[in-house]
Amino acid sequence: MSNMQQKTDVILIGAGIMSATLGSLLKELAPEWEIKVFEKLASAGEESSNEWNNAGTGHSALCELNYTSEKADGSIDISKAVKVNEQFQLSRQFWAYLVKSKLIRNPQDFIMPLPHMSLVQGEKNVEFLKNRFEALSKNPLFQGMEFSDAPETLKRWLPLIMEGRTSNEPMAATKIDSGTDVNFGALTRMLFDYLKTKNVELNYKHSVENIKRTKNGLWEVKVHDMNSGKIEHHTAKFVFIGGGGGSLPLLQKTGIPESKHIGGFPVSGLFMVCKNQKVVEQHHAKVYGKAKVGAPPMSVPHLDTRYIDNKKALLFGPFAGFSPKFLKTGSNLDLIGSVKPNNVLTMLAAGVKEMGLTKYLIQQVMLSHEKRMEELREFIPNAKSEDWDIVVAGQRVQVIKDTDAGGKGTLQFGTEVVSAADGSIAALLGASPGASTAVHVMLEVLEKCFPSRMVEWEEKIKEMIPSYGISLTENPRLFQDLHTSTGRTLGLNEKETVHN
């Protein structure tokens, strides 16, 4: 099969949650289209989407304090929190559609109800949290949130965190029971199992080596079949690059103007995992703290109940690490290989600007197990070193680009779609909130790349995702109806009652 040209309609690069979501949307909207997936690893959902390689938070800004910034006058800007929550609702609706249509089954294998909590210490932070609570409580998306600074209430909400605490420093927490823990690895595998039944061709252990434009305007993808050692050439009208940290180098190979002046900075994550099941059972929430002054947004510490392989686990982190690899399974040459003549100045400018981040990463890399335990004990005063191990999570490649607001070499902390002007190719770059907003991001890919089909597809999109194109903040009744119905379909409402 070496060097044979094989034509198809759509090529998806990377078998993670993004390609799984886009493939699932396309198979519902254009079932006749032929889709091929190429994945370097031996199975789906093994890199960034894997359950051990991300925090598993259904990011909806219920507890993540970095989505609500404090203005100069002390008031709270909730616009980003509302945006992230609205985006998560789209994912929740699409997953419910897939379950209701029996396209995927057993939602409890990928999503569980779990209280989302914010926890702060110190008078100033308590005031910030109270102001945040008051601002969010006015929005229908955040109804049901509770605030308390009463020690007795905190002991009831957070027994493991409050036990053995000797400091008299003021503390406060917010709690909302409608949060979720999402196993994106399990969900990814379910979606690809469904796509297989729809005749999507899944090619594992197939590494994409190059992407180039053909004379007739198609895209030719050069693929190394790692099973046979052969080289294959596949052409498609549309290509999506959803390779996590590996997307940037592939985007650069396309040569599209939109790929210029973009760099990537890899940050690895470490979590501490509790191996004492008695301790695990004493905690039932995702509890997010506040990032230390000067620390980057991805450093917000959190203590999380997780459900992995249907077993309850307890993780704390993240601690940052540094590796020049763009993927956990990548190469030490990834970072240097991504520096091109068109982005070298952008990368250098970021290096000068981000000395604080560099210093932070160096400090994090140098931490011993006992130093990490000291940070954990800010959450769990009685934590014992022998109860906790380190797990290396996935690589995240933060986007570096030139922006009007930030100037040359500005580090971006979001998720970003880069597409060709004609919509024939798109890539997903960046990190948080990532997988939680997969449906929103893939709808953005459809809007950018298939604008002429959107009118035709709109009715089906709204059947799958009823709030598409609608602000739920401005339609509280619709939000309540959808939240109840999706909760019922995904098995969240009943379990919320059981756990709480």
Swiss-Prot record:
Pathway: Carbohydrate metabolism; tricarboxylic acid cycle; oxaloacetate from (S)-malate (quinone route): step 1/1. GO terms for biological process: tricarboxylic acid cycle. Keywords: FAD, Flavoprotein, Oxidoreductase, Tricarboxylic acid cycle. It is an enzyme of class 1 (oxidoreductase). One of its GO terms (molecular function) is L-malate dehydrogenase (quinone) activity. Its EC number is 1.1.5.4. It catalyses: (S)-malate + a quinone = a quinol + oxaloacetate. It comes from the Bacteria. Its cofactor is FAD. Belongs to the MQO family. HAMAP family: MQO (MF_00212). This is Probable malate:quinone oxidoreductase.
